[in-house]
Amino acid sequence: MTDANQTRPKLAITMGDAAGIGPEISLRVWDSPEVQSQGYPLLFGDAAIYHRAAKKLGCDCPGTISLAEFLDMPKQSIPSDAPHGVIVDCGKLTTEELGSFTPGKFSAATGRASYQSVTDAIDAAVSGHVDAIVTGPIQKEAWHQAGIDFPGHTELLADRAGRAVQGEPADVRMMLASDTIACVLETIHIPLADVASQLNTESLVRTINLAGETVQRRNQNRGSLLPPRIAVCGLNPHAGENGLFSHQEEEQIILPAIEAARQSGWTIEGPLSPDTAFTPAMRERIDIYVCMYHDQGLIPLKALSFDDAVNVTLGLPIIRTSVDHGTAMDLAWQGKASINSMLAAIRWAVP
């Protein structure tokens, strides 16, 4: 083991759903010069799936160690016989499940396996065995078929990492970002009809603070001392138009949160009318948007940065980033999937 290896952060890259493009994009990035220069890739998932995908795609595959072997290693070390990366064999399908497995067709079995690889990676991060988690795309319906109650990665991370209790207001927030635009969501995977009732000033203040702190750290890492420029979107058309198109959410919830956050020194615009918040002129003067619900932030982000955006969970005691796309079952194991979002997620994950 070299001194260079000792200083490389260990990145747990989870497979995602085995039937989707997750195995492919992990295999196509693990030995790239960019990834190798930034960290030590640990591919968390079923080794049999990785090897089968590598054979079909004609690409290289790292060596394999079991999860138990990895956890038995000293936390600061990496396998000396695998200096470029390794598969941590976990989240396994049974022999019978492997026999009936078909790329592009998810199942309860692939849902259970992807869930297990994520929980193993979370536990490894919490215990200090890895420095960050980069998650591959899961199939939420497969999780549901497997009897898993969490609607997605973010809720699972919040619960398992000890940052929130299921059913209570979460301490974590979802941020989607690219070099073009960054959005933090106040609410995540809930029906649109429930959004207004879930908004409250205290939670929104935390969201604004997390958004500002994230941009501030990233600016500092890039050698910039410029303060973050934050925009907070309104909930309603035209930000409520002084109550004409709203039930006073802007006046009673959003404005008080903005005023409270300004007391912490943040530079904030808002509440902005959502239909004009993302124009080119606005984006030039805004570093990060705080959005009230899922599609308010993700529609502009995916329209502008579909192939190279990254999902970052804010407020966790560990670092977690993710690709900002789904499993793309129609492209699975064909060598056609873009790796840009995975590369961006790895860049954001490096401490």
UniProtKB/Swiss-Prot annotation:
Pathway: Cofactor biosynthesis; pyridoxine 5'-phosphate biosynthesis; pyridoxine 5'-phosphate from D-erythrose 4-phosphate: step 4/5
Protein name: 4-hydroxythreonine-4-phosphate dehydrogenase
Keywords assigned: Cytoplasm, Metal-binding, NAD, NADP, Oxidoreductase, Pyridoxine biosynthesis
Gene of this entry: pdxA
Cofactor dependency: a divalent metal cation
Family annotation (NCBIfam families): pdxA (TIGR00557)
Keyword NADP among UniProt keywords: yes
Its job: Catalyzes the NAD(P)-dependent oxidation of 4-(phosphooxy)-L-threonine (HTP) into 2-amino-3-oxo-4-(phosphooxy)butyric acid which spontaneously decarboxylates to form 3-amino-2-oxopropyl phosphate (AHAP).
Gene3D superfamilies: Isopropylmalate Dehydrogenase
Family: Belongs to the PdxA family.
Catalytic activity of the protein: 4-(phosphooxy)-L-threonine + NAD(+) = 3-amino-2-oxopropyl phosphate + CO2 + NADH
Binding site for a divalent metal cation: 189, 238, 294
Record's subunit section: Homodimer.
